[in-house]
């Protein structure tokens, strides 16, 4: 007996109890897949959808189909299709990273970047939605950075993760590296065309994670630094075609930029200690408009007795309110009846309206401000540093772009 779901994934619009699904152009096996990742103020939604079965998947699924009626079929073709999809979905991008990769290890069980492949060719899409979440008109299919090479039988896809109020989207696309074969790189989508953020061959992987209404995008790029594959945060001006990498907490710190607001404040996650074998990471805030600005550890912006260790900043709005992921110690009773402590992942909301204008140095009893050469002006410090007010805490459902 087998259970077959109606689809792999569906992009869902939800508002006040109303739910609308977005269906893909191609649904031949397992119902296809769609995702809605972002929506702007005009109801223009960004995401991706299956558009065709890949050549490799067609071949593998065909191998599961008997050529004659006498062959005993032990499982339906849907089981074969699902096993193929599951294997591709969890495959690692081993061609880009021959070394162990400790930072951001949740990308795959082996610690490497997930290739996040599919039985389908997938394309980034923009859907115009009405007030009820229904698609208006014809969706806009987005391109890839390069066309698929003739001998490449794998899925070849693009993905839109963010869209601004000017209709410019950002995300990822498969492309080709001269030495590494197929890789995923950051892409900007303008009028359906996929545009590269960089063509520098030192970069092996990357993504655009957000774009503001000034057409400045942010995300990460992966490159080999000191014989290790590490990520570097970046901002990219679409109008000026200018890429700027972020400094990180220290030289060689793996950094991922997750979001940028219209004031140019970037938030994300980065390694904070260069000397440890297993590097801890922290959520950061960075003013990309300030010359010589340095990363601000968000743990320095909350009170020293706060029970949270902020490990990642996920988003920031134009009021400076940050949604972040934190660890919180929690006691529990084990099977032997003993009290134990474990870290629980929670989401915290940080509000700059509670600013006190000082960074906390929790190693000093007097809790004095130790700026260590930070170059942000006093106005910025007052506006963004004092994020001491914890507004709400709730369980996090994480989203990862591989």
Regions found by a protein language model. Give the residues of each.
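N-terminal secretory targeting and juxtamembrane "stalk" segments of secreted and cell-surface proteins
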Residues: 384-386, 399-402
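Residue-level hotspots at or immediately adjacent to binding/recognition sites across diverse folds
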Residues: 1-380, 391-399
